[in-house]
Structures are given as C-alpha cells and as structure tokens.
C-alpha cells in the first residue's frame, strides 16, 4: 500500500506524539471528577465510572490521533487506527482499574512507593502515569505503525 521507507517511522512518531497529547487531554481534561473518584471502587457504581472513563478516554485518544494524522498529511488505514484504539482503551482500563498495578507493586517490592501518599507525592498516581506513557501509548503507536503499511 505505502512503501516509502520512512513512512512507518513517521506514522510511529506522529502516533506517539498524538498519543501523549490525547492521553493528557483524556485523563486530565475530559475525565469526569465523579469517574476519577469512583473508578477503582469494586461496586456497580465503580464499574460504571471505570467504563465511562474508558469510553471517553478511547474516543479522545482516537480523535486526537486522527487529527494529528490529518495535520501531518498521513493516510493511516481505519483498521490500524481502530485496532490501536481498542488495544489502548483496554490497556488503559486495566491500568486504571488499579488491581494489576497493585499486584505489580507488591510483586516487585514497590508496594511502599505505590502506597506513598504524602508530602505532595502520590506513588500510585506516578506508577499509573508511567504505565500509561511507558507501556500503553507505545503499544498503541507500534500497532498503528505496523498496521499502516
């Protein structure tokens, strides 16, 4: 479809940059306060809050990337964009659920940092954001680039 040697690298770079922007927008500007407060509760209300945030996150992330591809003059197939959006939304939901991150912290001996919540530092929030920006966004960007050829 597109064989230019720099195309995949360009798609990867634009996707990654837009992914960072979409993440910040979705997590800090779009996410409703009530969802942020309830999404880790193991109740029907908590599950609805997590689902609500996941949906708004996925839509915001996908829209941000689509706008960036358009601005960069890139034609990225819908299949690549949709697959990456689904993978990132699922990953984001799993991270924001909190249980996997708590298990990771416990298994790796980082539970003290995970539970740190004083002096202006929140270890769990920092680990959450590191998971999003260090794992989830790169995964979505690499999937997009791989499927864009």
Question: What positions do the PLM features span?
Answer:
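Short amphipathic, positively biased membrane-proximal segments
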Residues: 1-149
């Amino acid at each position: 479809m597109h064989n230019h040697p720099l195309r995949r690298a360009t798609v990867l770079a634009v996707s990654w940059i837009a992914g960072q922007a979409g993440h910040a927008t979705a997590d800090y500007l779009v996410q409703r306060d009530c969802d942020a407060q309830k999404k880790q509760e193991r109740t029907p209300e908590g599950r609805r809050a997590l689902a609500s945030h996941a949906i708004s996150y996925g839509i915001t992330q996908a829209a941000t990337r689509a706008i960036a591809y358009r601005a960069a003059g890139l034609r990225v197939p819908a299949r690549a964009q949709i697959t990456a959006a689904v993978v990132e939304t699922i990953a984001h939901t799993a991270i924001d659920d909190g249980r996997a991150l708590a298990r990771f912290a416990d298994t790796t001996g980082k539970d003290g940092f995970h539970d740190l919540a004083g002096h202006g530092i929140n270890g769990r929030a920092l680990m959450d954001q590191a998971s999003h920006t260090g794992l989830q966004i790169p995964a979505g960007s690499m999937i997009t680039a791989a499927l864009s050829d």
